[in-house]
């Protein structure tokens, strides 16, 4: 099958590799290289780098609105396009160019968590499970009919990083299975149960110890590794990256023992944290180099 692959971040790479091992990938579309690092030199995206490793042709248009870009896309004569966190809106002529259309791997069980940050939001909301969906793309935001889905439980200590990696592999396996079975009937999304995963705002990252422990724990895990939920310790901003619910109670922010902190209801034990300019470290290692005050702000 002739496939166009469209993706940009690390999440997309397992799907690209899985498809390239089984189908003819006629082109890989990714966002243009962006300035990154201390030198602010343009750096190709993870998908761009993976495509080059696989010897696949890469295209990096700024947008796909011009007749030239759309004509170049159609000229590839692809059977299908697979879109995984590409980051650009696809105009209708692009959506209609492959005879099997454009399929999207979305990291939620649609229609729950349409939008930009479905993994973060599922954890932060306390969802018991999530998954990946293969959706036939249309003009609306994640509104297309669903061809296939796979589910996974969200563990009590899962972070966004953990779930990201698991869902990326699940999506890769599911898209390979779906491509093998095309054409497939697609199930329209139900009108009930629609929620939107708004993009994460860094203002959401400051920890309020007055909230219930369950909410603080989900905030820490849901925002790990980026942007990282944080609190001030001795005037230093420290990111808290892993946690679990713990026994105990006290005034919000009070250090009960080790790195166990009282919340508005219950307590949270911090398992991993990151000081400014340092690598992430287990809580025990953090505590060897930093004394916690009696109470955190």
Swiss-Prot record:
It catalyses: L-methionyl-tRNA(fMet) + (6R)-10-formyltetrahydrofolate = N-formyl-L-methionyl-tRNA(fMet) + (6S)-5,6,7,8-tetrahydrofolate + H(+). Attaches a formyl group to the free amino group of methionyl-tRNA(fMet). The formyl group appears to play a dual role in the initiator identity of N-formylmethionyl-tRNA by promoting its recognition by IF2 and preventing the misappropriation of this tRNA by the elongation apparatus. Belongs to the Fmt family. HAMAP family: Formyl_trans. Keywords: Protein biosynthesis, Transferase. (6S)-5,6,7,8-tetrahydrofolate binds at residues 108-111. Its EC number is 2.1.2.9. The gene is fmt. It comes from Paracoccus denitrificans (strain Pd 1222). This is Methionyl-tRNA formyltransferase. GO terms for cellular component: cytosol. Residues 31-52 are annotated as: Disordered. Pfam families: Formyl_trans_C, Formyl_trans_N. GO terms for molecular function: methionyl-tRNA formyltransferase activity. It is an enzyme of class 2 (transferase). It comes from the Bacteria.
């Amino acid at each position: 099958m002739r496939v166009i692959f469209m993706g940009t971040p690390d999440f997309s790479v397992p799907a690209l590799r899985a498809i390239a091992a089984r189908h003819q990938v006629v082109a890989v579309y990714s966002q243009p290289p962006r300035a990154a690092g201390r030198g602010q030199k343009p750096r190709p995206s993870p998908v761009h780098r993976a495509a080059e490793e696989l010897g696949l042709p890469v295209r990096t248009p700024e947008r796909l609105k011009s007749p030239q870009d759309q004509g170049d896309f159609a000229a590839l004569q692809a059977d299908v396009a697979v879109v995984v966190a590409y980051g650009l809106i696809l105009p209708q002529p692009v959506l209609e160019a492959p005879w099997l259309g454009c399929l999207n791997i979305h990291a939620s069980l649609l229609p729950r968590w349409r939008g930009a940050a479905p993994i973060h939001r599922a954890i932060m909301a306390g969802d018991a499970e999530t998954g990946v969906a293969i959706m036939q793309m249309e003009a609306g935001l994640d509104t297309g009919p669903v061809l296939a889905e796979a589910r996974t439980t969200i563990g009590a200590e899962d972070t966004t990083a953990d779930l990201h990696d698991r869902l990326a592999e699940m999506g890769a396996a599911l898209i390979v299975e779906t491509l093998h079975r095309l054409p497939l009937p697609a199930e329209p999304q139900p009108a009930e149960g629609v929620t939107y995963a708004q993009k994460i705002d860094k203002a959401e990252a400051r920890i309020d110890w007055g909230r219930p422990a369950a909410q603080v724990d989900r905030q820490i895990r849901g925002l790990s590794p980026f942007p990282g939920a944080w609190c001030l310790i001795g005037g230093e901003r420290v990111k808290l990256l892993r946690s679990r619910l713990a026994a105990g109670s006290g005034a919000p922010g009070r250090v009960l023992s080790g790195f166990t902190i009282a919340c508005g209801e219950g307590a949270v034990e911090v398992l991993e944290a990151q000081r400014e300019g340092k690598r992430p470290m287990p809580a025990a290692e953090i505590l060897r180099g930093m004394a916690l005050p009696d109470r955190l702000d």
